[in-house]
Each structure stands twice: as structure tokens, then as C-alpha cells.
Amino acid sequence: MIVLGIETSCDETSVALVEDNTVIANLVYSQIQIHKKFGGVVPEIAAREHLKRLPILFSELISQTNINIERIDGIAVTKGPGLIGALLVGVSFAKGLALRYKKPLVGINHIIGHVYSNYLAYPDLKPPYIVLMVSGGHTLILKVEENNNVTILGRSVDDAVGEAFDKIARLLGLGYPGGPEIDKISKNGNPNAFNFPKPKMYDPDYNFSFSGLKTAVLYEIKRLTKSGYSENNLPIPDLAASAQEVMIDVLLHKVTKAARDNNLKNIVLAGGVAANSRLREKIRALSEEFNFYIPPLEYCSDNAAMIARAGLERIKSGENDGLNFEPVPNFFEMMST
């Protein structure tokens, strides 16, 4: 079975063809360079770029794979959560194709799509397992049960971890997006140089809070400046490495606690922050107790291959949302549908 995936939830335009667990092609157009000068994603610009790029990318996909759309068994498109304008572009395009070529169409939860990115690398992966979802928009701990029911065990009560990376990077004068910049510069820093607080780390629940860490970094920069450092000679690698270490320690403490409390050994990572090299390094130290599933780097960020793979399950079982669904930008509304 071949499924076409379409992803336009934020600032990546992506289309893919997936046959079972094999990615035939996965094309991604990133808008990072466009949004970089604004220090973050501008929703209206993102939607306009999707509108411009999606038809071009789709034509390239068909041309490169030499697979006629008549051979495609179904279409999967990101339904939400995400930016409403961006989502509308993808959903409208998918509906047009489904109507024109009489193909089944399913709307996919973007969060679940990230989970399914692991199935592209680990086709034998099966529930139950715990998910650590770490991205610019969401930080979640999920429990996926054998019947594929998903329960939210924990979430960030303020900033998502990817958002915290961006904000701390801005404080340190680094570029956008902040996660890769902090990851890179931290390799030259001491992760124990600064004793930043670890918010909610030892609370009994599985929730996260990262806004206080951003404030702690800001106060440390002010303290260093008052003590004689100029803005040009601040110990940026040490500050970045120390802040990154706190975020990773909190993430791993919470997700392993959730796994132990639920008597589960399998932990699945998902989302853009799963590409962080320090996170991957520290996971290796836990590999004797837990089985970690980490998506390949190319499937950590938003992509249509993961959407196609998630849709394949539903289309194979005969599901078809048809044309009677709309994008759902809100996370909690999306998780309840």
C-alpha cells in the first residue's frame, strides 16, 4: 500500500510517499531562513510560503518517483495541532487531490505523526510504550497502550522545551532556531559550570516547567555583567551547556519515572529536540534499564513521511475521513478528537 503524506503544520512544507515501512521519497522545504530574521515563525508568512511551495513540491515528488497518483492508495494530511493558516493550506490541497482522484483521505494528529516516525526505523515497534515528545511547540509524556489508546501523563505547564531553547539562545546572542545553536556551542562548554535550578524535577507528577530556567539564565548573565564581564566575553559555551544539561536531566528524569511507575521498558522519543546530541548521549547511559527508540535525524523535525506512515494504519483498516473535517490548531482539542 502506498500513501501520500502532506505536512504543513508550522514552517516546513513536506510531501512524501511511503509504502508500508519504506519511505519511497520524502521532500521537505524549510522556511527557517525566511523566519530567522524575525527570531521566530511568523504565521502569515508561513501560510503564504506553504501556498507557494506545496504544489511545486508535490510535482517534484511525482516526477522524482515516477509514481502516477493513480497508483497511490490513499492520502494522509496533518490536521493539527499547528498554525491554522498553515494547516488550512495542507488540508485544502489534500482535499482537492482526494476529490479529483477519488482517494481515501485521513486527517492525522501531528503529535501522533511524530510518534510514528519511529516506525520508519523500527518496524517491529509495538505498544505499550512511553513517549517523550519534545519539540518547539510541545513537551509531553504519553502512554501508548496495546489498543493504541493514548493517555497524556505529563506536559509542560509553560514553555515547551524547544521554546525554552529558542528563548535561552536569544539571551545568549545565538541564532534561530535555538536548539541546534545551543547543541553546537555546548560541545565547547562545561555543563556543570553553572548551577541552574531544575524546575519540577522532583515533583511527584510528570509535568515540566522551563520558563524559570530562562529567567535564571537571564539573572546569571546580569550577575556576570555586574561582576566585570562585558557582553562580548561572557562564557557563552558554559552558559549554554549548563542550561542544556538542566533541560535534558529534567526530561530524562521525568520520562524514566513515568516508565518505572507504569512498569514499562520501552521509551519512544519524538519531535525536533530528539535530534539533540547531548540528549542522545545521555540516553546511552540508561540503555541497560530501558529500551530507547530514537528516530533518525531526518525524521526528528516535521516531515510528511511520518504523517504518511501514521495514515497508512488507518487507510489500511478502511478508514476515510472524506472531505468533512477541518484543521484543529489547538492541542487539547486535537488530542480529544
UniProtKB/Swiss-Prot annotation:
It is found in: Cytoplasm. GO terms for molecular function: iron ion binding; N(6)-L-threonylcarbamoyladenine synthase activity. InterPro entries: ATPase_NBD (IPR043129), Gcp-like_dom (IPR000905), KAE1/TsaD (IPR017861), Peptidase_M22_CS (IPR017860), TsaD (IPR022450). It comes from the Bacteria. One of its GO terms (biological process) is tRNA threonylcarbamoyladenosine modification. One of its GO terms (cellular component) is cytoplasm. Its cofactor is Fe(2+). Binds 1 Fe(2+) ion per subunit. Pfam families: TsaD. It catalyses: L-threonylcarbamoyladenylate + adenosine(37) in tRNA = N(6)-L-threonylcarbamoyladenosine(37) in tRNA + AMP + H(+). Fe cation binds at residues 110, 114, 302. Substrate binds at residues 133-137, 166, 179, 183, 276. It is an enzyme of class 2 (transferase). Its EC number is 2.3.1.234. Its main location: cytoplasm. Keywords: Acyltransferase, Cytoplasm, Iron, Metal-binding, Transferase, tRNA processing. Required for the formation of a threonylcarbamoyl group on adenosine at position 37 (t(6)A37) in tRNAs that read codons beginning with adenine. Is involved in the transfer of the threonylcarbamoyl moiety of threonylcarbamoyl-AMP (TC-AMP) to the N6 group of A37, together with TsaE and TsaB. TsaD likely plays a direct catalytic role in this reaction. Belongs to the KAE1 / TsaD family. NCBIfam families: gcp_kae1, T6A_TsaD_YgjD. This is tRNA N6-adenosine threonylcarbamoyltransferase.
